[in-house]
Amino acid sequence: IQMNMQEMATAVVSKLPVKIIILNNRFHGMVRQWQDLFYNGRYASSDLENTPDFVKLAEAYGAVGLRANTMDDLDGVLKKAIETEGPVIVDVPTYRFENCYPMIPAGGCNHEMILEDPPELKQKQAGGTKVTPQDKDTVLTA
């Protein structure tokens, strides 16, 4: 979202009923996932520990900002977002190293789709992935 946040201004001015749900892992998530899968976890410009407060950012644009702080909050927050007129940003904190599947590797075909973490990545994550204090407060995990 940070690569095209300026579009929120257009959504507000045009009163578009756009609902944006940010699965916020404080990374450029897909970039980090590629760096894990294809570059042995060598992160370059993907770790965003100092992400903005997306609720305040939405409000700065004149939109509505919501956050689901727990799994119990999620249904109510999503319902409120849908019922709200105009643009809404919903911030959903997630585990920093959660991956998003399915995905197709660069230059790959549909039959080469990756459906889950490969065993070596699962083992690496189970054996010592750094969990930050913020991760203990996340709402969505595998």
Predicted features and spans:
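Thiamine diphosphate
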Residues: 1-142
